[in-house]
Amino acid sequence: MGADAIQVHPTPPGFWGSPKLDEDRISTFKEAAAKYGHPPFYFHAVYLINLAGDDPTMRSRSESTLTGYLKSADELGVNGVIFHTGSHKGAGFEERLPSILEHLRKVLERADPKTARLLIENNAGLGGSVGARFEEIARMLDGLGDPRVGVCFDTCHAFASGYDERTPADVARTIDELDKVVGLKNVDVIHCNDSVTGLGSNRDRHANIGTGEIGENGFRSLLHEPRLAALPFILEVPGAGNGPDAEQVAVLRRLASS
């Protein structure tokens, strides 16, 4: 495929469960990582997680699942676990923030990661999803005050939430805002996805690079933004129907070099 950064779903993303590891799997993974020079490697947690809702059973299960993910990531030497905080389902961010922080503290306490980070992904903003605005992510980071927690910045979700990325000036403004509110020092990885729907649509629909509303000019601008140069870019696009592929990686490389 020609990629040099990796994200995987170690368990089916639409079902509850955490990775199950044994010594053989751990050893095999670490040998392969060493063979290929330890590329940036991330887990994406299951999509069912909701730490922001009012159902205590759902929150408890979400906490347990995320804890298992973070433990496994740390055992393997994976860079981090990317996750969606969930939806407050109309209760409001301020109402649910204390509960979110409580559960995330417990995840960190129980997993006790030495190197793997817990990475909050920004959301598209549909249905009370938490983290669509940079200010909400900043509140969670500040409330935790833990260097083991960082951010995954998703280009499609940001665009759907109203952060424009279509021109060099748009990208500069959005990254200025991200740095001012969240702090680029907290951003660990970028999900690089075009958007099927328009600016501020609050809809999470990924498109192949250059075929959506952000467009090639937007991604060229993102790839040439010097403040993002050291970060891995992870594709989460449909490709030819089976997800990210060599063609989409080649598109990014072409835009980065043009």
Stretches with model-predicted labels:
Residues 1-45, 49-71, 258:
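N-terminal pre-domain/capping segments
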Residues 4-8, 41-45, 81-83, 118-120, ...:
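Hydrophobic faces of well-ordered beta-strands that scaffold small-molecule active sites
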Residues 11-13, 46-48, 86-88, 121-125, ...:
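Active-site beta-loop-alpha junctions enriched in small/polar residues
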Residues 12-25, 49-52, 88-91, 126-131, ...:
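Acidic-and-aromatic substrate-binding clefts and catalytic sites of carbohydrate-active enzymes
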Residues 21-27, 63-66, 97-101, 133-137, ...:
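Charged helix-capping and loop-helix junction motifs
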Residues 23-43, 100-113, 138-144, 213-226:
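Alpha-helix-loop-beta-strand connector modules within alpha/beta enzyme cores
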Residues 51-150:
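Active-site acidic/histidine proton-transfer and metal-coordination neighborhood
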Residues 134, 138-258:
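Histidine-acidic metal/acid-base catalytic patches
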